[in-house]
Amino acid sequence: MIDNKVSVCSVGKVVITEVATFASHPLYIDRKTALTMIRSTRAASRLRLGARYYASHAPYGVLSEHLKRTPRTNSQHYYPPPQGAHDLPKVSSMGDSIASIVRGRELWVQEKDKSDKPEKSDKPDKTDKTDKDKPEKQDKDKTDKPEKTKVSHTPSSTASTGAGEAAAPPSAPPSGSGSSSSSGGGSPPAKKKKSPAQTYPEILAVPISDRPLLPGFHRALVIRDPNVMKAIDEMITRGEPYLACFFLKEFSNADVIQDASEVHDIGVIAEIQIQSQDHKRSTVDASNEPVYVLILYPHKRVRLNSLKNPPSSGGAVSYASVSEDVAEDGELLLTSKDLEGYSEEFLEAREEAKKAKSGKTEDSKHDSKVTSKDGKETTEKYDSSTLQESPYSFLSTYDVSTAAISLIEDKPHDKNNRVITTLTNEILNVFKMLRAEDATLREQLSSVVGDILRTEPAVLQEPGRLADFAAALCAGEGKEIQAVLTALDLETRLNRALILLKREHTNAKLQQKIARDVENKLNSKHKKFLLTEQMKAIKKELGVDDGKEKLVEKFNERAEKLDMPENIQKVFEEEMTRLQSMEPSSSEYSVTRNYLDWITQIPWNKTTEDRFNLPQAKDVLDSEHYGMKEVKDRILEFIAVSRMKGGLTGKILLLQGPPGVGKTSIGKSIAKALNRQFYRFSVGGTNDASEVKGHRRTYVGAIPGRLVQALKQTQTENPLILIDEIDKLSSSRTQGDPGAALLEALDPEQNNAFLDHYLDVPIDLSKVLFVCTSNDLSTIPWPLLDRMEVIEMSGYVPDEKLNIANQYLVPQSKKETGLENVNVQVTDDAINALNRQYCRESGVRNLKKHIEKIFRKVVVKIVGEYGQDEVAAEKIIDVEPVEKDKESAEKKTTKSKSKEVNEEPAAKEEKDKATESAESSETKVGTKAPPVTVPEDYSLTIDEKDLYDYVNSPPYSSDRMFEDPPPGVVMGLAYSPLGGSALYIECILDGGLSADSSARLSSTGNLGNVMKESTNIAYSFAKSFMIRNFPANRFFERAGIHLHCPAGAISKDGPSAGCAVVTGLLSLALNHPIDSSISMTGEISLTGKVMKIGGLREKAVGAHSAGAKTIIIPKDNSGDWDELPDTVKEGLTPVFAGTYQDVYDVVFQGLDTKVAAEVWKKQFDLIDRKLDKRGSK
């Protein structure tokens, strides 16, 4: 650390000595630069020991000819200047001045001609002798004309004397220090002197805002008020450079005191020793206003008796209130914490002093009393009328504040007081500790403390000055320093100064510790840097360059751009240390390098800004997808909730629906609506858990899982990740279960610390929006399904498919086939025919294929008609030379790659030429054909009748198998991944009714177990229904029934065909055909209850496609029917059935019950006769 110390030489120069660790040299600057430096000390709010700048200088007359003082001739001077002010003494060098300054003295140096020496301070003053011998004459002179005397101009003297009185010599102790009360044993009595006057004329009063002045210690002061500047100029011109300084109670930048209550009543009288004259160099504020920078030397403590306001404020006189010195014994300032570290001697002395003072009271307003020469305290009242004309009377012409002040002295004390002695020793001990702790103060304090220790008896006689020095050294608050200035009781002053000094010592220790830690850290980094540079130099000399340095530099650059969490940063630093300590040939080198490459590409704490605009999100979803109301509403709800909460959180959504309905594409639209990055990966057929959670680093070619790869690719922590085909996961005994691995990632309570096997550090996935797709929920593991919010996506109805084709599929297909600007139209009838006869699936993927096929046929037709004449003749290209050139270029490139990373310029140039030759050779291979020009009047319309020419014959002719169905045939409804369709139930009598036949039911049609059980339940219910309603009809006693569901290649399962099976069996038993326009669905119970089914939307679409007019559905599905779009319900009459009786009433209207009861009577009569014959035999 560099400590700058400023001193003024006798020739008007300023010397700055820089004390550094390795060198020390002086710099000489001019006066203006010195004032600029002094001004900068104002920003530090004080000039004190230990600051960066400390100035000691001669009186103002040395630096400027303008400031030279002339001998006074005014006989009415009431306050004579100090002795030596006319003689312009010189200041010593820096080495000798520091110790003198901190003790509050100036060291006067002899002139160049050694002959002019100052008189010794121990000689008696002739003025004193004259005054003693002629007291009466002196009293007379007081009335007529004050006697001009010279006062020693040394800070150690009591710089305030009365009219016609001489001050003590420089070597005498200050008044109030205890020397006046004790004469010392055996010494001759001192000559009597007149006691100094205690009341002074009205002089300029200046407020101090940041830190009070202490007697004996220089201080810089900035004056901004122009009136105060002018007053100071005249004061300097008149040779009266003295002013009173008082500390403000509240901070203010004013230079005028408006009322005595604004300042503390105890301040100092100070002498102006340096005044700046260059306004430009003295400007310190942003307004560029001229200011004065004054260097003040405070002499003595004074009390403010009264204050005269500026003339602009009325010139009223306000009187200062006497401050009470609270806690004179220091109890309020000295806490139990402050007592830590005190010596036992001090604590014992302190307790004895407290006991001695117990029960006694003192007048708290002792500051208003003065001490006479005989040691008695008297109260002196200020009366301006008794004073003679003041040399400062000219100040009344300026708009400044003036004050009447009184000199105050320290309270008498016993020099054998143990508490004062112990406090003095404690302060000296703290000085020693400060010298050891603070390097800035070490040089100054070494000389000061050493001198104090050598002259300890003298210090004990001046404890007040020691307390002021300690307070000036400390960086306490202004009120704390003012408390030291106010304390006239030496014990209290020492106590308060000691507390401030101990706080300064604590701060010094803390600063030293911080500096030590910083230095150690810097040294460690510097050492590491030097070793690294040396290693680079050694490798360069040996010709070994493995590229490790560039790799390390690349990783460090990446890491600086990332906001890594603390734990990730620690792992990164450890792996970097490992990488630097490895050799490139090591097997672990590539593993660590790949790991660092991954960990520095993860977007730690980096997110994209979400979009909370509901109308804009709705427009994005509607522009890219038709329908899907439930999905769009859920996304808008998600955005609205996030807007209400103030931020988006991670969600796990599952879109379940048939293929081709847009589950994957809606995921992209959701990401676009939310302004998030999109990443998709399919887990269909995945049977390795490492695909989700990554591989261990020990395996060759190990990489992180797909979730970490998604973060790397999207470069954000809040993307939308689409996990496609999650219902097609599989498991393996050896490679784990990927479905179980997804449990951690898809659990909102756990994914904030997802642990990938490769990275092996927690990763926050809580901000990711997961969207999964599935065709069948039954194959998803239940724990995984429980973590997701399921949104069902139904298949499209014909009207929706028509709109999707016109708005999306047809324009997209025309653009892909080059017909974007050609007038080719596909009519709505053609698209409806495609949906009805070619593409019955719930999705539109197959419809898109057929539309693309149509436009491809159109393109072939157009190119064949208009494109043959425009095709340019193809040139025959010899491919072999091209391949040879390419091979040679590749060989050159391979050779250049085998060299070191740092190639020579010539090698790089060859490589570039080889690459250019290879590229130029490759460009000769392909040719670009000109586009076909189609006439503007060309037009083509594709109608339903033209479909055969483009997409061949339809695979489906009609959904209705029977226009007039026979008895036993009924139209049911089925739902499959392809959508809804009509499912006919056919029942026939197998083998007729005979005596040898028996009741039985057989079923075919690739039925599943659930549907087989449903047919058995329906058969049992049908028999019971016939017994209850048609007891005479004995059909089910002997009938062998065969039940079949057409389209045997398609597997069928589910309980929803129960009502249709019962109806088919009853239709056969009653020999009554069912209307072909009636379709039905519903599960039947054994007692005839019609139960709720699923897939009502698709089944309604199937009924509509089959031409049904009436649809019978369970009563519990009435709410689902109301939610269906009107385009689906149009043309269908719903019938809600609670029991099968409701179904029977609709499908068997107009049935003749008598005929139905006897429809099989003839057959059963024959059977009975045969059985009777067999019985009679």
UniProtKB/Swiss-Prot annotation:
Pfam family, one: AAA
Residue numbers annotated as active site: 1056, 1099
Domain Lon N-terminal: 203-505
UniProt biased composition (Basic and acidic residues): 103-150, 353-383, 883-916
Keyword GTP-binding: no
Enzyme Commission number(s) of this protein: 3.4.21.53
GO biological process: cellular response to oxidative stress; chaperone-mediated protein complex assembly; mitochondrion organization; oxidation-dependent protein catabolic process; protein quality control for misfolded or incompletely synthesized proteins
Positions of region (Disordered): 72-197, 353-386, 883-932
Major localization class: mitochondrion
Occurrences of domain Lon proteolytic (ranges): 964-1150
Biased composition (Low complexity): 154-182
Catalysed reactions, semicolon-separated: Hydrolysis of proteins in presence of ATP
SMART domains the record matches: AAA, LON
Superkingdom in the source lineage: Eukaryota
Subunit-level organization: Homohexamer or homoheptamer. Organized in a ring with a central cavity.
Family assignment from sequence similarity: Belongs to the peptidase S16 family.
Other remarks on this protein: This protein may be expected to contain an N-terminal transit peptide but none has been predicted.
Its job: ATP-dependent serine protease that mediates the selective degradation of misfolded, unassembled or oxidatively damaged polypeptides as well as certain short-lived regulatory proteins in the mitochondrial matrix. May also have a chaperone function in the assembly of inner membrane protein complexes. Participates in the regulation of mitochondrial gene expression and in the maintenance of the integrity of the mitochondrial genome. Binds to mitochondrial DNA in a site-specific manner.
Name by which UniProt lists this protein: Lon protease homolog, mitochondrial
Biological classification of the source: Eukaryota, Fungi, Dikarya, Ascomycota, Saccharomycotina
Protein encoded by which gene: PIM1
